[in-house]
Amino acid sequence: MLCFNDFNFPKEWEVVPNSFKYIDIVIKEIIGFGLIKENDQELKMIVNQAISIAAYFWPYANEEQMVMGGSVLCWCVLFDDPLDTNKLDEKKGLEIVSRTEKLLLTRTLPNNPTNLEKYGFTIFEKCLKYCGTNTHMYDMLIKLTVQWIYSIIPFNKLNESPVHPETLKYIRKINIGIEFTQSIFYIINSNNKVDLIVLANPLYQKLVDLSSLNISFVNDAASFCKEIKDGGSDNNLFIILMKRLGGIEFIKEAYKQLTDLSNGYIDEFCYYEKLLLSSLSKQQQNEIQIFIDHLKYLMKGNQIWSTKTIRYATEDHPIIQLRNSTNKLIENNINMDKVSLTNKNYI
């Protein structure tokens, strides 16, 4: 039996989640764009579960900001899903990424736009309008969104051969989407005065990288059963560590390696936070502290959300906090006795 609390995020990083009212508004949006049907209760619930994490990411945002952030996350989920699960062939996937990049960079819809492209165009234009004259924050959002969409297909290619943990960690820093998520927070706070030189500081980037890795470690542990069932275990660090140790019988040892790595990065985060703040003026410290705190909310909030959502829940999950026998919507159950992680035949 494994314990999720072995990921030892400081208690003071925990905050009460925001209201979930934005979810119904966002779902009505995507129904209006023809992305899901009004009577498709199952798909509506899946979207609900996916974007509910925004309440943990932005605990102090107002309703307008939550709808804006929730809409961008929803677009992210709808864009990522067919690419992330290899539902499309490579050529079609690359075409979608290229079309989306052009849409974002030129702020122009392509010929014969899809409903998802229309939705993406609309919500990103809302983000730009919200920024007012502080368009530099919008520029950062676009830059990091393009960076993220180009990481999806390479990340999936890790399934094609055994991957070294360091290779996975390098790609995962981008693919996990935390820098992209942080850029949504830049939009939310675009009316606050911020010295962009501070956000360009390499010590701040180090904090973003450490946050990205920590969230990816938590996600890999939480999604263990889901990844085994869906065949995505070749790019899951938790499972890779198990395979390198010799198989499923080494699950406890692999989990300790993963949590030790995470906790070491938490210590590094605290160290580099102090180092960064000590190098700044008092005004710069005040400007950047809100963004550093947000990274903490992302890390701790993601851990808490993982125990609340049915996205990863299953009655036989090896992590006790993620066991849920009432999850009937998303089928993640696997037979642990039939799991083999010594080769490609996982089940």
UniProtKB/Swiss-Prot annotation:
Any one GO molecular-function label of the UniProt entry: beta-pinacene synthase activity
GO biological process: terpene biosynthetic process
SUPFAM superfamilies noted in UniProt: Terpenoid synthases (SSF48576)
Motif NDxxSxxxD/E motif per UniProt: ranges: 219-227
Record carries keyword Protein biosynthesis: no
Induction: Expression is almost undetectable in vegetatively growing cells and increases during development induced by starvation. Expression starts to decrease during culmination (from 18 to 24 hours after induction).
Enzyme Commission number: 4.2.3.-, 4.2.3.200, 4.2.3.46, 4.2.3.47
Catalytic activity: (2E,6E,10E)-geranylgeranyl diphosphate = beta-pinacene + diphosphate; (2E,6E)-farnesyl diphosphate = (E)-beta-farnesene + diphosphate; (2E,6E)-farnesyl diphosphate = (3E,6E)-alpha-farnesene + diphosphate; (2E,6E)-farnesyl diphosphate = (1S,2S,4R)-beta-elemene + diphosphate
Sequence motif: DDxx(x)D/E motif, positions: 80-85
Claim: Ligase is one of the keywords in the record: no
Transmembrane segments: none
Stored InterPro entries: Isoprenoid_synthase_dom_sf, Terpene_cyclase-like_2
Keywords: Lyase, Metal-binding
Coiled-coil residue spans: none
Function text: Terpene synthase that converts its substrate geranylgeranyl diphosphate (GGPP) into the diterpene beta-pinacene. Is also able to convert farnesyl diphosphate (FPP) into the sesquiterpene (E)-beta-farnesene as well as (E,E)-alpha-farnesene and beta-elemene as minor products.
Entry similarity comment: Belongs to the terpene synthase family.
Domain notes: Contains several highly conserved motifs that are important for catalytic activity including the aspartate-rich 'DDxx(x)D/E' motif and the 'NDxxSxxxD/E' motif, both of which are involved in complexing metal ions to coordinate the binding of the isoprenyl diphosphate substrate in the active site.
Name listed for the protein in its UniProt record: Beta-pinacene synthase
UniProt organism field: Dictyostelium discoideum
Gene symbol of the encoding locus: TPS5
